[in-house]
Regions:
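Non-globular, low-confidence helical/coil segments that flank catalytic cores
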Residues: 1-293
Length: 293
C-alpha cells in the first residue's frame, strides 16, 4: 500500500547533482561537436577494399557516397557523426557492386534516410536486391541521377552530376557509375566511383577544364590501372589524390602505374590502407586533413 509522505530532498541530493552534471556534460558535448563540424567535412572512411565517403555541409546536410562492403561503415561513423544523430539526408550509389553498397543496408537499419540516388546500372546480386527491398519497405524515394543535376547541400556546398549523360542500364556497373564534382568556395572534389578510361574520355569531351579542375581527386576504382588515365589526371590537376583500398588486398590496389601517373602531375597521395579514415575539413578557402586508424 502506498503511503503518503514528504519527499526527502536531502536523501537524493547527490543523485540529483550527478544527473544535473550529466545533462550539462551532454549539452556541452553536443555543442562542442556541432561547433567543430562547421564548414565542409569530407571523409573517406576506412571501409577496407571498397568505397565509403561521408559529406556534411555547414548547414548539417549529410550525404553518403557509397557505403563500402558489408559490416564496415558503421564502425567509422564515430569519427564523423555525433552519437545523437540518427539521420542521413541522402545516399548516393555510384555503382551497385557489393564493395560500394554492402554497408548501405546497415545504414538503412540504423538511420533514417531521406532519399537514395543512383546511376541506373543494373545487377541481380543478392546484396543489391536486399537493399532495394529495404528501401521499398521504408518508402525511401529512389532517384536516377543524370548529367546537369545539381544537389544543393546548403551553406554554399553543391554537388554537380557529370555522369551518366545517357541510359546506362546495360552498361558495365563500373563504367556506368555516377561521376560528380563537389564544390564549396575554392575547395572542390572530383568523385569518380569506379569509372575507367572509357567514361573518363566522355567526361573530358563534355566538360571544360574549368568545370573539371579540382582540389581533390577521389581516385577511380581504388587505384586500378584501368582508371586515372594521364589525360584525365592532367585536366583534373588535383593537389591531393585520395585512394580507398584495403590493406594487402588481393587486387594489388593501388597499382604502380596509377601511383606513377598521380606523382607525375605533382599530386599528394593519401591512402586509407596506410592512414585509416581520411577527414578533410574546409572553410571554403583552405583544406586541412586528419587521419584516424
Amino acid at each position: 500500500m502506498f503511503r503518503e509522505g514528504k519527499f526527502n530532498i536531502k536523501k537524493y541530493r547527490l543523485f540529483i547533482f550527478v544527473i544535473l552534471l550529466l545533462v550539462i556534460y551532454i549539452f556541452l558535448l553536443k555543442n562542442d561537436w556541432e561547433n567543430s563540424h562547421r564548414g565542409l567535412t569530407f571523409a573517406m572512411l576506412d571501409v577496407g577494399q571498397g568505397d565509403g565517403i561521408f559529406i556534411e555541409s555547414p548547414t548539417g546536410t549529410q550525404v553518403m557516397f557509397d557505403g563500402g562492403p558489408p559490416r564496415k561503415v558503421l564502425g567509422s561513423f564515430s569519427r564523423v557523426m555525433s552519437p545523437f544523430d540518427k539521420t542521413i539526408d541522402a545516399l548516393i550509389i555510384t555503382n551497385p557492386d557489393a564493395d560500394h553498397i554492402g554497408g548501405f543496408l546497415d545504414i538503412l537499419k540504423n538511420y533514417k534516410v531521406g532519399v537514395v540516388f543512383e546511376s541506373g546500372t543494373l545487377t541481380d546480386s543478392k546484396t543489391y536486391q536486399s537493399l532495394r527491398e529495404e528501401m521499398k519497405n521504408q518508402n525511401i524515394p529512389d532517384i536516377l541521377v543524370e548529367r546537369g543535376m545539381k544537389l544543393d547541400l546548403g551553406g554554399g556546398v553543391m554537388i554537380d552530376i557529370l555522369f551518366p549523360d545517357r541510359d546506362v542500364s546495360e552498361w558495365a556497373t563500373n563504367d556506368g557509375g555516377v561521376v560528380a564534382r563537389l564544390s564549396y568556395g575554392k575547395t572542390s572534389v572530383m568523385l569518380t566511383g569506379d569509372i575507367g578510361a572509357k567514361t573518363e574520355k566522355i567526361i573530358l569531351s563534355e566538360n571544360s577544364e574549368a568545370q573539371l579542375t579540382s582540389t581533390i581527386l577521389k581516385v577511380g576504382h581504388h587505384g586500378s590501372h584501368t582508371s586515372s588515365s594521364s589525360s584525365f589526371v592532367k585536366i583534373i590537376s588535383p593537389e591531393y589524390s585520395l585512394i580507398s583500398d584495403g590493406k594487402n588486398n588481393s587486387y594489388g590496389h593501388p597499382h604502380r602505374e596509377t601511383l606513377d601517373t598521380l606523382t607525375k602531375f605533382g599530386s599528394k597521395i593519401l591512402r586509407t590502407d596506410l592512414l585509416g579514415t581520411i577527414i578533410m575539413k574546409s572553410d571554403g578557402q583552405d583544406v586541412n586533413f586528419s587521419f584516424h586508424k
